[in-house]
Amino acid sequence: MRWLDKFGESLSRSVAHKTSRRSVLRSVGKLMVGSAFVLPVLPVARAAGGGGSSSGADHISLNPDLANEDEVNSCDYWRHCAVDGFLCSCCGGTTTTCPPGSTPSPISWIGTCHNPHDGKDYLISYHDCCGKTACGRCQCNTQTRERPGYEFFLHNDVNWCMANENSTFHCTTSVLVGLAKN
């Protein structure tokens, strides 16, 4: 193992004598910027990647189909704690699906909402439905736990339809992801 130590020491000394700190920082910076174009660097799920998953968390007490229509179409419904837009359940879709003629955005924002029925917090993924003009019904602008714009994946004032071919916003769905963990 002594030979490995000597080899490592001579290699590091050689590099230190032949390069400057600025050149090393420049090389690392080029590598990071270059990799941003090749590798996904944003914490979002892309539609082509099949990032959506079903956690099985939509059991009977959480199923929006079992809640009455007035409750689901209200901004006070527990799943809508971070919605900024029109509820798809008022626009021809459901709490979890886009209306016909619109497509879900492949990127979304998330929120943690408290379910008063079981006292637990749940992670909710909000997807904008795009491709049709704004619905205009059931406008909600809730900002529970919203973060500043520089934490954009937790910020609900962004037009998330910008990832679609047709970036016209129509409405927003509230998809239950699972239990929030501390």
Swiss-Prot record:
The gene is aauA. Residues 1-47 form the signal peptide. Gene3D superfamilies: Methylamine/Aralkylamine dehydrogenase light chain. Its EC number is 1.4.9.2. Disulfide bonds join 75-140, 81-113, 88-171, 90-138, 91-135, 98-129, 130-161. The modification Tryptophylquinone is found at residue 109. Irreversibly inhibited by phenylhydrazine, hydroxylamine, semicarbazide, hydrazine and aminoguanidine. Reversibly inhibited by isonicotinic acid hydrazide (isoniazid) and isonicotinic acid 2-isopropyl hydrazide (iproniazid). InterPro entries: Amine_DH_Ltc, MADH/AADH_L_sf, MADH/AADH_Ltc_C_dom, TAT_signal. It is found in: Periplasm. This is Aralkylamine dehydrogenase light chain.
